[in-house]
């Protein structure tokens, strides 16, 4: 409910500043009020300049990302708030922003880069399903967008995929692939032998955790849904693996 006591009919989008405290993010205080993660329930929590957040503030996100809820304990009461949000975060590759750039030389020392990147812990990064490194866009490519898929076309595909997932999981009272438990992953994310071999290679080469393994399967299930296919292909698995390699490259 809003301050005007009207029902919220749009998904929330929360964008807290990087100076936000642990209490501001997860909730708490004398009255055990909900924090940003609960205010973003069924919506998006966007953390811009992720390494600029206090590391201890970021670490409190780990459990809610798994449980999709948060328990706030006070001396006289315990409050449980929902926290089923989509975390979207952005960051530069280094303090100056040009590490790995082909356009401009990075001015940071190796120690500066390591300190900056390691503000994001491995366990937190392991809970982020899709990790994408984005290069700067060349002007000529930016202007040549006539053949690209439009936002409306992408939106239509996403809506179709969401409807597929809502129908598929109706009996479990969940709405998306992201909410799949390990047991449901085994049922709905089945792959062929070639895909299993590819997963095994990636698991060993990238030293993936079991959590990362399950998230690759969930992302590949989503890729297949976006393409309108019932079965997960080897290509879907390969694409999903590419979205998990960033933490092994820099962290």
Where are the predicted features?
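A short alpha-helix capping/helix-coil boundary motif
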Residues: 1, 14, 39, 178-179, ...
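Short, basic, glycine/proline-bearing loop/turn elements
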Residues: 19-23, 102-105
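Basic, amphipathic alpha-helical bundle interface domains used for macromolecular binding and assembly
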Residues: 31-32, 50, 55-251
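Conserved alpha-helical scaffold flanking the Walker A/P-loop in AAA+ ATPase domains
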Residues: 7, 12, 20-45, 78
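Conserved P-loop
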Residues: 1-10, 231
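Hydrophobic alpha-helix-in-membranes signature
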Residues: 11, 15, 92-94
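Histidine-centered active-site/metal-ligand motif
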Residues: 17, 41, 236
């Amino acid at each position: 409910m809003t301050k005007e006591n009207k029902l919220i009919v749009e998904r929330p989008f929360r964008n807290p500043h990087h100076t936000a405290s642990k209490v501001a993010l997860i909730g708490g205080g004398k009255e055990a009020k909900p924090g940003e993660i609960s205010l973003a329930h069924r919506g998006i929590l966007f953390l811009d300049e992720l390494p600029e957040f206090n590391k201890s503030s970021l670490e409190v996100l780990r459990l809610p990302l798994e449980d999709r809820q948060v328990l706030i304990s006070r001396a006289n009461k315990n409050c449980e708030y929902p926290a089923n949000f989509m975390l979207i975060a952005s960051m530069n590759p280094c303090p100056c922003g040009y590490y790995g750039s082909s356009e401009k030389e990075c001015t940071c020392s190796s120690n500066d880069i390591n300190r900056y990147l390691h503000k994001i812990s491995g366990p937190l990064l392991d809970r982020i399903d899709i990790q994408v490194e984005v290069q700067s866009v060349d002007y000529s490519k930016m202007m040549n967008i006539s053949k690209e898929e439009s936002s409306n076309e992408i939106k239509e595909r996403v809506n179709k995929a969401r409807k597929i997932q809502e129908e598929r999981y109706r009996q479990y009272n969940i709405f998306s692939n992201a909410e799949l438990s390990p047991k449901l992953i085994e049922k709905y994310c089945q792959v062929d032998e070639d895909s299993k071999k590819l997963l095994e290679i990636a698991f060993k080469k990238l030293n993936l955790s079991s959590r990362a393994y399950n998230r690759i399967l969930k992302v590949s299930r989503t890729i297949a849904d976006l393409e309108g296919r019932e079965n997960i292909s080897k290509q879907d698995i390969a694409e999903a693996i590419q979205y998990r390699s960033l933490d092994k490259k820099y962290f």
